[in-house]
Amino acid sequence: MKSKTHLGHTARKRFGQNFLHDNNIIQNIVMAIYPQKEQFLVEIGPGLGALTEPVAEKVERLTVIELDRDLAERLRHHPFLHQKLNVIEYDAMQFNFEQLYIDENLAEKNQKLRVFGNLPYNISTPLMFHLFKYHAIIQDMHFMLQKEVVKRLCAAPNSKAYGRLTIMAQYFCQVLPVLEVPPTAFKPAPKVESAVVRLIPHKELPYPVKDLYWLNRVTTQAFNQRRKTLRNALSTLFSAEKLTALAIDLEARAENLSIADYARLANYLADNPPTEDLQSE
């Protein structure tokens, strides 16, 4: 039977806990993050401190956000790092990163947040969507994720991995794969392969939309029916004539459109919101 206990703490399934313990992998991740002494770093889900300790050694202060009460308390009493750590016991998916940015006077210091973490795989996608809202105040993000999620983040159009997550991530960020991580690097070992990704928010959005609601709406509708042609998948939002006028191939499918295409559709809807569902033509 595989042990779920590491360094005296039993992994909790509801928090999706898998603790990183491979020192070579840890050092490679820290090198990729490249923390600098004066920078403001935030770790999400520090767990038992595998990344916390080597990163904290390189900075003056490190903020960590941990939902597990036992782990948060453990970090508050860390034998040699507790004075460097600002431990916030909170759900990162509900956390207001802009308030942290304001409280720390980062604008006056001409700094942005640098965010990293070994994310629980069961919340990684909604957590990234939450963080994208704060793209203007984030310098970069480094996350350990399920390998398949990293493939989706990095995907190009016309591929099976390309989807709504791809579009939303690349709308806000430059996405770069960093390294792959085997299950044996964790305790307990997950059943899936993992990988580290770097997300660098664009200083200027390459395809700005007028209202994110419509980008979310059109991508959700298209990819929820990705086997259908766009003529059918988007029939409640656009007539066939309008799609053609917007330079969209009626026989194309969701994965065939670029981010620029989806932004163009979203901006049309922002200016011309459908008053009621259209019928397929």
From Swiss-Prot:
Q: Where does this protein hold S-adenosyl-L-methionine?
A: N18, L20, G45, E66, D91, N118
Q: InterPro entries, from UniProt? A: KsgA/Erm (IPR001737), rRNA_Ade_diMease-like_C (IPR023165), rRNA_Ade_Mease_Trfase_CS (IPR020596), rRNA_Ade_methylase_Trfase_N (IPR020598), rRNA_adenine_dimethylase (IPR011530), SAM-dependent_MTases_sf (IPR029063)
- Output the superkingdom of the source species: Bacteria
Cell location:
Cytoplasm
Q: Does the keyword Transferase apply?
A: yes
What sections of the sequence does the record tag as coiled-coil? none
Q: Which residues cross the membrane?
A: none
Q: Which GO terms describe its cellular component?
A: cytosol
The family note in this entry says: Belongs to the class I-like SAM-binding methyltransferase superfamily. rRNA adenine N(6)-methyltransferase family. RsmA subfamily.
Please give the function described in this protein's UniProt entry: Specifically dimethylates two adjacent adenosines (A1518 and A1519) in the loop of a conserved hairpin near the 3'-end of 16S rRNA in the 30S particle. May play a critical role in biogenesis of 30S subunits.
Specify the protein name.
Answer: Ribosomal RNA small subunit methyltransferase A
Lineage, opening ranks: Bacteria, Pseudomonadati, Pseudomonadota, Gammaproteobacteria, Pasteurellales
Encoding gene per record:
rsmA
